[in-house]
Amino acid sequence: MKKTIALLLCLCMLACLFVGCASTSTTEKPTSETTTTETAASGTSASGNKVLKIGIFEPLTGDNGAGGKQETLGPQYGNYVQPTIEIGGETYDIQLEIVDNRTTAENGPSAASELVNRGVSIVLGSYGSGVSMAGGKVFEEAGIPAIGIGCTNPQVTSDCSVYFRVCFLDPFQGSVMASFAMEEFGAKKAYVLSMLGDDYTVGLAKNFVIAFEAAGGEIVADETFVEGTADFSAYLNNAVAGGADVIFAPSAIAYAPQIIEQASALGISLPILGGDTWENSAISDAQNGTDMQVFVSTFFDESDESGLAKEFVTGYKAWLNGNSQNLTNNGGNDVVAAVSALGYDAYMTAVAAIEKAQSTDGTAIRDALAGLSIDAVTGSISFDANGDAIKSTAYIKQAIDGGFQFYKVQNAD
Protein backbone atom coordinates (compact mmCIF):
# COMPACT_ATOMS: atom_id res chain seq x y z
CA MET A 1 0.00 0.00 0.00
CA LYS A 2 2.81 2.42 0.89
CA LYS A 3 4.48 1.77 -2.45
CA THR A 4 1.19 2.45 -4.26
CA ILE A 5 0.69 5.75 -2.44
CA ALA A 6 4.27 6.79 -3.15
CA LEU A 7 3.81 6.00 -6.83
CA LEU A 8 0.62 8.05 -6.99
CA LEU A 9 2.34 11.01 -5.31
CA CYS A 10 5.18 10.92 -7.84
CA LEU A 11 2.73 10.85 -10.73
CA CYS A 12 0.88 13.86 -9.29
CA MET A 13 4.12 15.80 -8.92
CA LEU A 14 5.10 15.05 -12.51
CA ALA A 15 1.70 16.15 -13.76
CA CYS A 16 1.99 19.46 -11.89
CA LEU A 17 5.46 19.97 -13.35
CA PHE A 18 4.24 19.51 -16.92
CA VAL A 19 1.28 21.82 -16.36
CA GLY A 20 3.61 24.49 -14.98
CA CYS A 21 5.93 24.19 -17.96
CA ALA A 22 3.08 24.32 -20.42
CA SER A 23 1.80 27.60 -18.93
CA THR A 24 5.07 29.45 -19.53
CA SER A 25 5.07 31.77 -22.56
CA THR A 26 8.19 32.98 -24.35
CA THR A 27 6.34 35.54 -26.45
CA GLU A 28 7.61 39.04 -25.57
CA LYS A 29 4.95 41.72 -25.38
CA PRO A 30 5.06 45.32 -24.16
CA THR A 31 5.01 45.46 -20.37
CA SER A 32 1.86 47.21 -19.26
CA GLU A 33 -0.37 48.10 -16.35
CA THR A 34 -3.59 49.92 -15.62
CA THR A 35 -3.96 52.48 -12.86
CA THR A 36 -7.06 53.77 -11.10
CA THR A 37 -10.23 51.70 -10.94
CA GLU A 38 -10.22 48.71 -13.27
CA THR A 39 -12.73 48.76 -16.11
CA ALA A 40 -15.52 46.22 -16.09
CA ALA A 41 -16.52 44.38 -19.26
CA SER A 42 -19.39 46.84 -19.68
CA GLY A 43 -17.02 49.81 -20.00
CA THR A 44 -17.84 51.17 -16.56
CA SER A 45 -15.66 51.34 -13.46
CA ALA A 46 -16.36 49.83 -10.06
CA SER A 47 -17.90 53.18 -9.09
CA GLY A 48 -20.50 52.77 -11.81
CA ASN A 49 -19.13 55.70 -13.82
CA LYS A 50 -18.17 55.45 -17.47
CA VAL A 51 -14.44 55.26 -18.15
CA LEU A 52 -12.19 57.44 -20.30
CA LYS A 53 -8.77 55.95 -21.00
CA ILE A 54 -5.56 57.95 -21.34
CA GLY A 55 -2.57 56.02 -22.67
CA ILE A 56 0.88 56.39 -21.15
CA PHE A 57 3.52 55.58 -23.77
CA GLU A 58 6.82 55.46 -21.89
CA PRO A 59 10.08 53.50 -21.51
CA LEU A 60 10.00 51.74 -18.16
CA THR A 61 12.96 49.55 -19.14
CA GLY A 62 16.02 49.98 -21.37
CA ASP A 63 18.52 52.84 -21.56
CA ASN A 64 15.82 55.46 -20.87
CA GLY A 65 13.93 53.47 -18.23
CA ALA A 66 14.91 55.74 -15.34
CA GLY A 67 13.76 58.87 -17.15
CA GLY A 68 10.62 57.17 -18.41
CA LYS A 69 9.59 56.25 -14.88
CA GLN A 70 10.04 59.84 -13.73
CA GLU A 71 8.05 61.13 -16.70
CA THR A 72 5.26 58.63 -15.95
CA LEU A 73 4.99 59.91 -12.39
CA GLY A 74 3.68 63.25 -13.69
CA PRO A 75 0.47 61.89 -15.27
CA GLN A 76 0.03 59.52 -12.33
CA TYR A 77 0.02 62.47 -9.94
CA GLY A 78 -2.30 64.34 -12.31
CA ASN A 79 -4.67 61.39 -12.18
CA TYR A 80 -4.49 61.50 -8.38
CA VAL A 81 -5.36 65.22 -8.37
CA GLN A 82 -8.11 64.96 -11.00
CA PRO A 83 -9.37 61.38 -11.38
CA THR A 84 -12.69 62.24 -13.07
CA ILE A 85 -14.04 64.41 -15.88
CA GLU A 86 -17.50 65.63 -16.94
CA ILE A 87 -18.51 64.91 -20.54
CA GLY A 88 -22.01 65.56 -21.80
CA GLY A 89 -23.42 65.79 -18.30
CA GLU A 90 -21.95 62.45 -17.23
CA THR A 91 -19.03 61.72 -14.91
CA TYR A 92 -16.20 59.63 -16.36
CA ASP A 93 -13.44 58.01 -14.32
CA ILE A 94 -10.07 58.68 -15.98
CA GLN A 95 -8.07 55.48 -16.28
CA LEU A 96 -4.38 55.42 -17.16
CA GLU A 97 -3.25 52.63 -19.46
CA ILE A 98 0.52 52.37 -19.06
CA VAL A 99 2.57 50.50 -21.66
CA ASP A 100 6.36 50.07 -21.64
CA ASN A 101 7.85 50.90 -25.05
CA ARG A 102 11.26 49.66 -23.82
CA THR A 103 13.16 52.76 -25.04
CA THR A 104 13.86 51.79 -28.65
CA ALA A 105 12.16 52.83 -31.88
CA GLU A 106 11.88 49.16 -32.86
CA ASN A 107 9.51 48.55 -29.96
CA GLY A 108 7.52 51.75 -30.47
CA PRO A 109 4.91 50.47 -32.95
CA SER A 110 3.97 47.38 -30.92
CA ALA A 111 3.61 49.40 -27.71
CA ALA A 112 1.58 52.03 -29.55
CA SER A 113 -0.66 49.34 -31.05
CA GLU A 114 -1.26 47.95 -27.58
CA LEU A 115 -2.60 51.32 -26.46
CA VAL A 116 -4.79 51.61 -29.56
CA ASN A 117 -6.21 48.15 -28.87
CA ARG A 118 -7.08 49.20 -25.32
CA GLY A 119 -9.27 51.98 -26.66
CA VAL A 120 -7.46 55.04 -25.33
CA SER A 121 -8.76 58.45 -26.36
CA ILE A 122 -5.41 60.25 -26.13
CA VAL A 123 -1.78 59.29 -25.44
CA LEU A 124 0.92 60.97 -23.31
CA GLY A 125 4.66 60.41 -23.98
CA SER A 126 7.25 59.37 -24.75
CA TYR A 127 10.54 60.04 -23.05
CA GLY A 128 12.79 59.70 -26.09
CA SER A 129 12.20 61.16 -29.53
CA GLY A 130 12.97 58.12 -31.67
CA VAL A 131 10.37 55.90 -30.03
CA SER A 132 7.88 58.79 -30.12
CA MET A 133 8.30 59.12 -33.88
CA ALA A 134 7.89 55.37 -34.34
CA GLY A 135 4.73 55.27 -32.23
CA GLY A 136 3.35 58.42 -33.82
CA LYS A 137 2.71 56.64 -37.10
CA VAL A 138 0.45 54.14 -35.31
CA PHE A 139 -1.43 56.86 -33.43
CA GLU A 140 -1.89 58.88 -36.62
CA GLU A 141 -3.35 55.91 -38.48
CA ALA A 142 -5.74 55.26 -35.58
CA GLY A 143 -6.73 58.94 -35.33
CA ILE A 144 -5.63 59.16 -31.70
CA PRO A 145 -3.92 62.41 -30.58
CA ALA A 146 -0.72 62.30 -28.55
CA ILE A 147 1.02 64.84 -26.34
CA GLY A 148 4.78 64.50 -26.11
CA ILE A 149 6.16 65.28 -22.67
CA GLY A 150 9.95 65.47 -22.98
CA CYS A 151 10.56 64.39 -26.60
CA THR A 152 12.40 67.35 -28.10
CA ASN A 153 13.24 66.34 -31.70
CA PRO A 154 11.32 68.55 -34.19
CA GLN A 155 10.29 65.55 -36.30
CA VAL A 156 8.03 64.21 -33.55
CA THR A 157 5.39 66.79 -34.50
CA SER A 158 6.46 67.91 -37.97
CA ASP A 159 6.07 64.38 -39.36
CA CYS A 160 2.85 63.51 -37.50
CA SER A 161 -0.47 65.36 -37.67
CA VAL A 162 -1.77 64.06 -34.32
CA TYR A 163 1.31 64.75 -32.16
CA PHE A 164 1.58 67.79 -29.89
CA ARG A 165 4.17 68.45 -27.18
CA VAL A 166 4.54 70.53 -23.99
CA CYS A 167 8.37 70.84 -23.97
CA PHE A 168 10.80 72.99 -25.92
CA LEU A 169 12.57 71.68 -29.04
CA ASP A 170 16.15 70.66 -29.76
CA PRO A 171 16.96 73.66 -32.00
CA PHE A 172 16.13 75.89 -29.04
CA GLN A 173 17.87 73.65 -26.50
CA GLY A 174 20.99 73.34 -28.65
CA SER A 175 21.14 77.11 -29.04
CA VAL A 176 20.64 77.59 -25.29
CA MET A 177 23.55 75.31 -24.42
CA ALA A 178 25.80 76.87 -27.06
CA SER A 179 25.06 80.32 -25.63
CA PHE A 180 25.66 79.04 -22.09
CA ALA A 181 29.02 77.51 -23.04
CA MET A 182 30.20 80.77 -24.58
CA GLU A 183 28.81 83.14 -21.97
CA GLU A 184 29.67 81.12 -18.87
CA PHE A 185 33.04 79.63 -19.81
CA GLY A 186 34.15 81.89 -22.65
CA ALA A 187 34.28 78.75 -24.77
CA LYS A 188 35.68 79.14 -28.27
CA LYS A 189 36.16 75.43 -28.96
CA ALA A 190 33.80 72.57 -28.16
CA TYR A 191 33.91 68.79 -28.42
CA VAL A 192 30.61 67.02 -29.17
CA LEU A 193 29.71 63.38 -28.44
CA SER A 194 26.40 61.63 -29.16
CA MET A 195 25.13 58.07 -29.62
CA LEU A 196 24.92 56.71 -33.15
CA GLY A 197 21.36 55.91 -34.21
CA ASP A 198 19.71 57.77 -31.32
CA ASP A 199 17.48 60.45 -32.86
CA TYR A 200 17.43 62.52 -29.67
CA THR A 201 21.16 62.66 -28.97
CA VAL A 202 22.25 63.03 -32.60
CA GLY A 203 19.61 65.70 -33.24
CA LEU A 204 20.50 67.73 -30.15
CA ALA A 205 24.20 67.46 -30.92
CA LYS A 206 23.57 68.71 -34.46
CA ASN A 207 21.64 71.73 -33.19
CA PHE A 208 24.37 72.57 -30.68
CA VAL A 209 26.97 72.43 -33.47
CA ILE A 210 24.90 74.71 -35.72
CA ALA A 211 24.39 77.30 -32.97
CA PHE A 212 27.97 77.16 -31.67
CA GLU A 213 29.49 77.61 -35.13
CA ALA A 214 26.99 80.33 -36.03
CA ALA A 215 28.18 82.27 -32.99
CA GLY A 216 31.80 82.02 -34.13
CA GLY A 217 32.83 78.92 -32.18
CA GLU A 218 34.85 75.95 -33.45
CA ILE A 219 33.86 72.30 -33.11
CA VAL A 220 37.12 70.38 -32.63
CA ALA A 221 35.33 67.05 -33.25
CA ASP A 222 31.74 65.84 -33.57
CA GLU A 223 31.87 62.13 -32.75
CA THR A 224 29.41 59.32 -32.08
CA PHE A 225 29.62 56.13 -30.02
CA VAL A 226 27.67 52.91 -30.55
CA GLU A 227 25.05 51.49 -28.22
CA GLY A 228 26.60 49.39 -25.47
CA THR A 229 29.86 51.37 -25.30
CA ALA A 230 31.50 51.13 -21.87
CA ASP A 231 34.90 52.76 -22.41
CA PHE A 232 34.80 56.46 -23.30
CA SER A 233 38.46 57.24 -22.61
CA ALA A 234 39.43 57.56 -26.29
CA TYR A 235 36.61 60.04 -26.93
CA LEU A 236 37.47 62.08 -23.85
CA ASN A 237 41.15 62.16 -24.78
CA ASN A 238 40.15 63.40 -28.25
CA ALA A 239 38.40 66.34 -26.60
CA VAL A 240 41.56 67.26 -24.71
CA ALA A 241 43.82 66.72 -27.72
CA GLY A 242 41.61 68.99 -29.81
CA GLY A 243 41.94 71.83 -27.32
CA ALA A 244 38.23 71.91 -26.45
CA ASP A 245 37.03 74.37 -23.82
CA VAL A 246 33.84 72.38 -23.11
CA ILE A 247 32.37 68.94 -23.83
CA PHE A 248 28.77 68.65 -25.01
CA ALA A 249 27.59 65.04 -24.61
CA PRO A 250 23.79 64.66 -24.75
CA SER A 251 23.54 60.90 -24.21
CA ALA A 252 21.00 58.60 -22.60
CA ILE A 253 21.06 58.27 -18.81
CA ALA A 254 22.66 54.82 -19.13
CA TYR A 255 25.91 56.30 -20.52
CA ALA A 256 26.21 59.72 -18.89
CA PRO A 257 27.54 58.45 -15.52
CA GLN A 258 30.32 56.54 -17.28
CA ILE A 259 31.33 59.62 -19.26
CA ILE A 260 31.49 61.73 -16.09
CA GLU A 261 33.28 59.12 -13.97
CA GLN A 262 35.84 58.29 -16.66
CA ALA A 263 36.55 61.97 -17.32
CA SER A 264 37.22 62.43 -13.62
CA ALA A 265 39.47 59.36 -13.50
CA LEU A 266 41.47 60.73 -16.44
CA GLY A 267 41.95 64.05 -14.65
CA ILE A 268 39.96 65.96 -17.27
CA SER A 269 38.65 69.22 -15.84
CA LEU A 270 36.67 70.46 -18.85
CA PRO A 271 33.04 71.42 -18.12
CA ILE A 272 30.67 68.72 -19.37
CA LEU A 273 27.28 69.86 -20.67
CA GLY A 274 24.25 67.65 -21.24
CA GLY A 275 20.67 68.02 -22.36
CA ASP A 276 17.38 67.57 -20.55
CA THR A 277 17.77 63.78 -20.17
CA TRP A 278 20.69 64.32 -17.81
CA GLU A 279 18.51 65.67 -15.02
CA ASN A 280 18.52 62.36 -13.16
CA SER A 281 20.01 61.17 -9.88
CA ALA A 282 22.32 58.77 -11.75
CA ILE A 283 24.13 61.81 -13.17
CA SER A 284 24.32 63.75 -9.90
CA ASP A 285 25.52 60.59 -8.12
CA ALA A 286 28.28 60.17 -10.71
CA GLN A 287 29.44 63.77 -10.19
CA ASN A 288 29.28 63.52 -6.40
CA GLY A 289 32.72 63.35 -4.82
CA THR A 290 34.46 64.68 -7.93
CA ASP A 291 35.53 68.12 -9.11
CA MET A 292 33.71 67.73 -12.42
CA GLN A 293 31.63 70.69 -13.61
CA VAL A 294 28.43 69.16 -14.98
CA PHE A 295 25.56 71.30 -16.28
CA VAL A 296 22.23 70.40 -17.88
CA SER A 297 19.43 72.28 -19.59
CA THR A 298 15.94 71.48 -18.42
CA PHE A 299 12.30 72.57 -18.35
CA PHE A 300 11.52 73.37 -14.70
CA ASP A 301 13.02 74.03 -11.30
CA GLU A 302 11.28 73.11 -8.06
CA SER A 303 12.38 76.34 -6.38
CA ASP A 304 10.14 78.28 -8.79
CA GLU A 305 7.38 79.86 -6.70
CA SER A 306 5.53 81.55 -9.54
CA GLY A 307 2.08 80.65 -10.81
CA LEU A 308 1.01 77.07 -10.12
CA ALA A 309 4.53 75.79 -9.43
CA LYS A 310 4.65 76.15 -5.64
CA GLU A 311 1.33 74.37 -5.09
CA PHE A 312 2.38 71.58 -7.44
CA VAL A 313 5.75 71.02 -5.76
CA THR A 314 4.20 70.82 -2.28
CA GLY A 315 1.49 68.39 -3.33
CA TYR A 316 3.75 66.29 -5.53
CA LYS A 317 6.38 65.79 -2.83
CA ALA A 318 3.71 64.72 -0.34
CA TRP A 319 2.33 62.26 -2.90
CA LEU A 320 5.80 60.85 -3.62
CA ASN A 321 6.63 60.40 0.05
CA GLY A 322 3.31 58.69 0.67
CA ASN A 323 4.17 55.75 -1.60
CA SER A 324 7.46 53.83 -1.53
CA GLN A 325 7.11 52.69 -5.15
CA ASN A 326 6.70 56.27 -6.32
CA LEU A 327 9.88 57.22 -4.47
CA THR A 328 11.73 54.30 -6.02
CA ASN A 329 10.56 55.29 -9.51
CA ASN A 330 11.80 58.82 -8.80
CA GLY A 331 15.31 57.58 -8.06
CA GLY A 332 14.85 57.10 -4.31
CA ASN A 333 14.30 60.76 -3.40
CA ASP A 334 11.59 63.42 -3.56
CA VAL A 335 13.41 65.86 -5.86
CA VAL A 336 10.98 67.07 -8.52
CA ALA A 337 12.32 66.12 -11.95
CA ALA A 338 11.42 68.57 -14.70
CA VAL A 339 9.94 65.77 -16.81
CA SER A 340 7.58 64.92 -13.95
CA ALA A 341 6.31 68.51 -13.90
CA LEU A 342 5.93 68.38 -17.68
CA GLY A 343 4.11 65.05 -17.38
CA TYR A 344 1.65 66.61 -14.97
CA ASP A 345 1.13 69.51 -17.37
CA ALA A 346 0.60 67.09 -20.26
CA TYR A 347 -2.09 65.27 -18.28
CA MET A 348 -3.87 68.49 -17.37
CA THR A 349 -3.59 69.68 -20.97
CA ALA A 350 -5.23 66.46 -22.15
CA VAL A 351 -8.01 66.85 -19.58
CA ALA A 352 -8.60 70.47 -20.64
CA ALA A 353 -8.81 69.43 -24.30
CA ILE A 354 -11.29 66.65 -23.52
CA GLU A 355 -13.41 69.05 -21.47
CA LYS A 356 -13.35 71.52 -24.35
CA ALA A 357 -14.26 68.85 -26.89
CA GLN A 358 -16.90 67.30 -24.62
CA SER A 359 -16.11 64.05 -26.36
CA THR A 360 -13.97 60.92 -26.09
CA ASP A 361 -13.43 60.95 -29.86
CA GLY A 362 -9.80 61.35 -30.91
CA THR A 363 -10.47 63.75 -33.77
CA ALA A 364 -12.57 66.04 -31.59
CA ILE A 365 -9.88 66.05 -28.89
CA ARG A 366 -7.16 66.77 -31.45
CA ASP A 367 -9.11 69.75 -32.79
CA ALA A 368 -9.61 71.03 -29.24
CA LEU A 369 -5.87 70.77 -28.53
CA ALA A 370 -5.00 72.89 -31.56
CA GLY A 371 -6.75 75.95 -30.16
CA LEU A 372 -6.06 75.36 -26.47
CA SER A 373 -4.32 77.81 -24.14
CA ILE A 374 -3.92 77.05 -20.42
CA ASP A 375 -1.87 78.12 -17.41
CA ALA A 376 0.40 75.28 -16.31
CA VAL A 377 3.10 74.42 -13.78
CA THR A 378 5.92 74.89 -16.31
CA GLY A 379 4.40 78.08 -17.73
CA SER A 380 1.52 78.84 -20.04
CA ILE A 381 0.88 76.26 -22.74
CA SER A 382 -0.42 76.93 -26.23
CA PHE A 383 0.57 75.33 -29.51
CA ASP A 384 1.86 76.60 -32.83
CA ALA A 385 0.79 75.25 -36.22
CA ASN A 386 3.04 72.18 -35.81
CA GLY A 387 1.62 71.32 -32.40
CA ASP A 388 4.72 72.52 -30.55
CA ALA A 389 4.42 74.38 -27.27
CA ILE A 390 5.59 77.97 -27.54
CA LYS A 391 8.59 78.13 -25.16
CA SER A 392 11.35 80.73 -24.84
CA THR A 393 13.16 79.87 -21.59
CA ALA A 394 15.34 77.02 -20.32
CA TYR A 395 16.65 76.35 -16.82
CA ILE A 396 20.32 75.52 -16.35
CA LYS A 397 21.10 73.26 -13.40
CA GLN A 398 24.42 72.07 -12.01
CA ALA A 399 24.99 68.54 -10.74
CA ILE A 400 26.79 69.02 -7.45
CA ASP A 401 27.05 67.31 -4.05
CA GLY A 402 24.74 64.47 -5.06
CA GLY A 403 21.92 66.66 -6.34
CA PHE A 404 20.99 69.38 -8.80
CA GLN A 405 21.13 73.08 -8.01
CA PHE A 406 19.46 75.79 -10.04
CA TYR A 407 22.18 77.79 -11.77
CA LYS A 408 20.50 80.30 -14.05
CA VAL A 409 17.72 80.95 -16.55
CA GLN A 410 19.15 80.86 -20.05
CA ASN A 411 17.63 82.17 -23.25
CA ALA A 412 18.87 81.39 -26.74
CA ASP A 413 20.59 84.29 -28.52
Segments from the language model and where they lie:
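Bacterial lipoprotein signal-peptidase II cleavage site
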Residues: 18-32
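Beta-alpha junction/loop-to-helix N-cap segments that form part of ligand/metal-binding clefts
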Residues: 66-73, 85-157, 166, 225-232, ...
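Extracytoplasmic "Venus flytrap"
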Residues: 48, 55-76, 99-105, 128, ...
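An alpha-beta-alpha
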Residues: 163-227, 246
